[in-house]
Amino acid sequence: MTDAGDTPPRPRETMRGQPRVLQPFLTWVTGVPLAGSAPRVRWRPGLAAAAGVAQTAIGIAVGALGLKAGGVLAVLLVLLAWPVIAGGMRRLDVVVVHQTLHRMFVASDAGNRVMSEILTTLLWRPPYDGNKEEHLLHHAYPCSLRDGDTNYLSGTGARPGMTRGEFRRYLVKAVFSPRHHWSFFSARVKANFFSRPPAYRLAMALVYLAATVAFLAFSGMWLPWLLLWFVPATFFFHNQTFLYTLSEHRWWLFDNAERLTKAQRDQLTFARFCGAPVPARSGGTTGGARRALAVAAWWARMVLVYAPYRLCVLVGDTVQHDLHHVRPKCDWANSSWERNDELTGDRAERFYEVWGGLLTHVYVGNSVLETSARPSVPLTPVAA
């Protein structure tokens, strides 16, 4: 079985010698703080929501600048903006809306409902009641055939036991499948208008639709809206949701059984840590130069491969999704440190992890041959 980051020291601890000013960036990208460290900023739910709004707005602004500039620059900036905008939308959906379903975004039931209904209306996502019912069913019967996410992935052609080559071909086919995108989009339309939502929620959806059409008709901004809202809210949102969901759990580990022991349920979810160990020092007269090049290449991967994955797909606290299933009432906005603390307590044996990137995580989530997760262990500080 293969297992990223299987040899000590832990991958995050190999980064201890990197510049101190860059450690918060490395904590964000990897999802793991250094052993013994404390957060420099204590996150709150409102700050998590603001981050989603800011990311979406910045992406739209970058795309708008591109459209204004025209030419090749327009193409480059719009291509850059698309996954960033969708990532901001995903942050609002899979982080903020998700926590409202668990009544963990604000203290009151009414407040959670209001926040959820506003965001799901704007993002064309399912209304609060149906969304909550389906999500709690996911928690009750994870990875079973009663779990809507399992059925969604099955519908895209996912299955266990594929080779890496077979799985990559499946990924490409699903990402560009018109059937996949139409199924996803039509389900969103149905949930908002035709699934008998509460009268107030149907009114919200209709007013939003009418306001959008009226604004576009009077402003003539159809092209910017199509490029900077509709495309990222559909094609990119669908695919970033799809890629996230593929690694959310080990979907086929126990053959979609409904009745599982606590230990089996724990094995279904793993922390999706991003990155690789810093290249080790080597001896010899040329060892320093070789390591400098290796570290530069390592930094390039962290910035150009793993950071976009965190920004656009594995957003917010979703890195530590195993913590959410072990302890849903945790301080989710600071889950990196919460999970580290759990590894020193009496629930430590309930946590699993995989180090790597998108492909590594989706391989493990779908039982691709020769891949697996490993149990987590408490972090131990090592010398830089």
Regions found by a protein language model. Name each.
Residues A296-Q320:
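Functional transmembrane helices that form membrane-embedded active or gating regions
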Residues V84-V97, D129, H180-S183, W229-R259, ...:
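Transmembrane alpha-helical segments that form the membrane-embedded catalytic/substrate-channel core
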Residues M1-G87, R91-L92, V96-V97, L101, ...:
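Non-catalytic, topology-defining segments of multipass membrane proteins
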Residues T120, Y244-E248, V319:
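Generic alpha-helical structural context detector
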Residues F105-L123, T150-R159, L260-R301:
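Juxtamembrane helix-capping/reentrant segments at transmembrane boundaries
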